[in-house]
Regions:
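Charge-rich amphipathic alpha-helical interaction elements
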Residues: 1-137
Length: 137
């Protein structure tokens, strides 16, 4: 019984660790989305500046190539974080099932011990009643 409780504690700790990792990855994904939106806004600002000024227009070609590379890198990182989030969600589901198994085993063990205890009490009461009845005769 003690080992089941220890295993339950470990399973809960693992589940909590996975939940924290998921929260970190979600925060990372949110930060990446903010960076992507900021980068898109910067590209739009540079496009407007390139339309206003001839020199800016000439320099925009190099900037556009670099901006495209940054956009691809951010998109790839966003995708990898999404994959990691999906993986962590699957691990959390598995860890939750495992935790529930230990909880159920503990419940069954406690129910079994309760039945044994009630049987012992009933046997003791029956013995006392038999002894009492024997004394009356």
């Amino acid at each position: 019984m003690k080992s089941l409780r220890t295993l339950l504690k470990l399973a809960r700790r693992d589940l909590e660790t996975l939940r924290r990792a998921l929260a970190e990855q979600i925060a990372r994904q949110t930060a990446l989305q903010d960076r992507i939106l900021g980068h898109e806004q910067t590209i739009k600002d540079e496009q407007r500046a390139a339309l206003r000024d001839y020199e800016s227009g000439r320099a925009y070609g190099g900037y556009a190539a670099a901006a495209l590379a940054v956009r691809r890198a951010l998109a790839a990182e966003h995708e990898s974080v999404g994959v990691e989030i999906d993986r962590l969600r699957a691990l959390i589901a598995e860890a939750h099932v495992e935790t529930r198994k230990f909880e159920r085993l503990i419940e069954l063990e406690e129910a079994r011990l309760k039945v044994q205890r009630e049987k012992r009490e009933d046997a003791a009461l029956d013995e006392m009643a038999t002894m009492r009845l024997g004394r009356r005769r």
